[in-house]
């Protein structure tokens, strides 16, 4: 015979003594639940750490389970980055966005995702016309839509791939003016111990997908086309023991899409065409010349990385080589070569990365911009001359801290970075940039706070001596990656608020 619960409960309530015991039991149960929640958070942090260690070990062994862009991008950083935000790749530098809790919308082997990002920018901006170069922030407009991203990822047996398209707000035009472009479009196949990608994919050059950088603005390697460079071609990756190798052939750059510029509505920095020219005194005339400049063709890339150590202590030493033909318009054809040596050290959650790069362009000295030591390069719908030969040292230090005690934050990664563009031309002023910042992540939210201090970066301030600003009517009137005639240290604070889905 089953006793009715009410029959048992009523006498007990009449006596009154079990009530304090019940309250005590409820309180003890609540304490146990809270303790279990904390233990679960700690376990999740340990699992993420073990996952990262497993990735490094698989990559070092050349295993096919570590695909060439693992984990897959949901956006990037990194970005980037210019105004970017790309992601982790096969390289050993962590990306600018690691979102462990984001579950994309999935149909069969296809994942649908994207991102929406907003910028707050403040810094050394004096003019009321943000159209003077790609300041992306000024005294007139501090807050703006940064990026809208749609992405499609494929993972079906040995086949994998990615499609990503981006829209950017144009701060130099009235809302809703914008430019947009294809970021990536490639299909890959995994073999037993190697893999192949075909399409618009990331060129395997340097220590990581964004040089050695973790920051929103990247390091200066990006602005000369040697980091996070998306081009059209084939990329093959394989491993042997502690070695990992990449080889690539790229027919062309990723191309120009929708914007106001002649050839620069694109994500990655490339040699481009423009409709501008300069006289022998360096005075620039915008839109007055036939299309002139260069386009990349038949690029060859090699990279080798050796891994030392395992688990929480490891080092990755490598070298990269690159050669590109340049198809001239209005000028004779040219070429470019580049090399880099790079090292990344990991100690628990600390990471120290360094890279030394060298590049040289061989171009026609008789050109419409009348400057043999400059070449037009463009991205983000803006082109401007860059030095044709330079050394590029870059270094970064970062630490990932798992915030298990803070329920609204998964992790924070503070970082310090420095890079320089040491130009061969004696009359040019070198470009330098130092950045301090942090990445903040929770669920689908990813926030970057950056304070960049730079001399010679068109994305960091526009102030000149006195009350002046960058003067784009002259080749030597701008704080840039070319002549850097402004020669002034400026700062830029960026708060980038992104939601990834």
Language-model features and meaning:
Residues 119-141, 356, 486-490:
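Outer-membrane beta-barrel transmembrane domain signature of Gram-negative proteins
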């Amino acid at each position: 015979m089953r006793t009715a619960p009410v029959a048992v409960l009523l006498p007990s309530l009449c006596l009154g003594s079990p009530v304090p015991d019940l309250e005590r039991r409820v309180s003890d149960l609540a304490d146990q639940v809270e303790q279990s929640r904390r233990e679960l958070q700690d376990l999740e942090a340990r699992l993420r750490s073990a996952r990262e260690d497993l990735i490094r070990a698989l990559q070092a062994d050349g295993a096919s389970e570590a695909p060439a862009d693992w984990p897959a991008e949901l956006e990037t950083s990194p970005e980037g980055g210019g105004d970017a935000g790309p992601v982790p790749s096969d390289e050993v530098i962590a990306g600018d966005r690691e979102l462990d809790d984001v579950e994309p919308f999935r149909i069969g082997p296809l994942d649908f995702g994207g991102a929406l990002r907003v910028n707050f920018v403040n810094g050394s901006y004096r003019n009321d016309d943000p159209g003077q170069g790609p300041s992306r922030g000024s005294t007139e407009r501090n807050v703006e839509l940064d990026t809208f991203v749609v992405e499609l990822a494929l993972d079906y047996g040995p086949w994998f791939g990615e499609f990503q398209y981006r829209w950017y707000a144009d701060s130099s035009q009235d809302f809703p003016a914008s430019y947009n472009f294809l970021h990536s479009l490639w299909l890959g196949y995994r073999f037993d111990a190697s893999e192949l990608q075909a399409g618009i994919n990331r060129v395997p050059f340097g220590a990581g997908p964004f040089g050695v950088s973790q920051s929103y603005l990247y390091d200066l390697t990006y602005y000369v086309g040697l980091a996070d460079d998306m081009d059209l071609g084939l990329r093959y990756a394989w491993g042997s023991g502690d070695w990992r190798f990449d080889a690539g052939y790229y027919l062309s750059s990723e191309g120009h899409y929708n914007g106001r510029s002649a050839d620069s509505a694109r994500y990655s920095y490339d040699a481009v065409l423009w409709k501008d020219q300069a006289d022998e005194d360096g005075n620039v005339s915008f839109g007055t010349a036939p299309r002139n400049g260069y386009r990349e063709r038949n690029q060859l890339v090699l990279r080798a990385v050796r891994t030392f150590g395992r688990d929480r202590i490891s080092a990755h030493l490598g070298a990269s080589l690159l050669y590109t033909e340049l198809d001239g318009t209005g000028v004779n054809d040219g070429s470019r070569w580049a090399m880099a040596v790079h090292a990344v050290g990991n100690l628990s959650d600390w990471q120290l990365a360094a890279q030394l790069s060298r590049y040289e362009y061989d171009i026609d000295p008789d050109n419409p911009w009348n400057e043999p030591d400059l070449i037009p390069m463009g991205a983000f719908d803006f082109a401007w001359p860059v030095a044709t030969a330079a050394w590029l040292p870059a270094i970064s230090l970062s630490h990932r801290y798992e915030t298990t005690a803070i329920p609204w934050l998964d992790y924070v990664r503070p970082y310090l970075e420095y890079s320089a563009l040491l130009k061969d031309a004696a009359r040019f002023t070198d470009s330098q940039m130092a950045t301090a910042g942090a990445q903040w992540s929770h669920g689908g939210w990813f926030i970057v706070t950056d304070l960049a201090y730079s001399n010679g970066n068109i994305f960091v301030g526009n102030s000149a001596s006195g009350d002046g600003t960058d003067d784009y009517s002259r080749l030597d009137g701008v704080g840039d990656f070319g002549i850097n005639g402004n020669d002034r240290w400026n700062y830029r604070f960026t708060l980038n608020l992104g939601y990834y889905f």
